Amino acid sequence: MRVSNNNEERKSCLKGVGVTKVFGTGNKKTVAVDHVDFDFKEGDIITIVGESGSGKTTLSKMLLGLISVTEGEIYYQGAPRDIKGARKKKEYWKNIQAIFQDPFASYNMFHKIDDVLLDCLNMRGCKDLPMEQKTQMMTEACSFVNLKFEELTNKYPFELSGGQQQRLMIARIFLLKPKILLADEPTSMIDACSRSTILDMLTKLRDEINMTVIFITHDIGLAYKISDKVYIMEHGKFVESGDAEDVIIHPKAAYTKRLISDVPKIYEEWDLSTV
């Protein structure tokens, strides 16, 4: 968690007012996200916590611009977000990137790793740089995530382990340097050791480029470990939000208290009868 400074005025990078998403109509209507308000500041690590079906992934898709907002308004850098048309949406996506739960599904299986990283440089506007300089930049990005670029050349992403694939995703973010990173359950499919490494790398990257990181997770323990701000989501609504310390150590909402009580404690005897 970041040490707060009350005198520090940080700008809003993503703000939502009454953001709502409705699927279907009539009797088949489902309100997935129900009039939520939020204000994500530059450089913060924000975690949206909720169980499956709470609406957090639907909200993340609206933040990314993958699906439309039914009601309400999303503001980007202080102004109403305008991503109508391919050109505006492409420009927006230069500044907001995502890491998903399944890294394998994020890659084109026919693209070699060097092509994946080169695409990032081209997207960033480095297409005309000498190849020697591009190689140096890709080497630096891989080094940041403890990978060796020379060992990845001519390999495909599917030849890497799950943890290595997620580290490669972070290398992409290192090259792209977006203003916002949305990480949807980025550590749920990798082992505990790799999970800790990935979280440390994302925190370090936030510190280096002042990137806003939005985590989507069901793991309230993870939220406490890494977050500056936490939003608790239940049935499409935010039932509680604020500083991570306040929300998780001094919860007010019954749902938040239940999420915390469900976290196994190492000193308690676990009930394995239902396993």
Regions found by a protein language model. Name each.
Residues 49-51:
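The feature captures the beta-strand-to-loop junction immediately N-terminal to the Walker
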Residues 64:
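Helix-to-loop junction immediately C-terminal to a conserved catalytic motif
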Residues 72-82:
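Conserved ABC transporter NBD signature motif
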Residues 81-97, 115, 123, 247-251:
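ABC ATPase NBD coupling module
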Residues 156-160, 164:
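Conserved ABC ATPase signature
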Residues 223-225:
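A short, surface-exposed alpha-helical micro-motif characterized by mixed small hydrophobic
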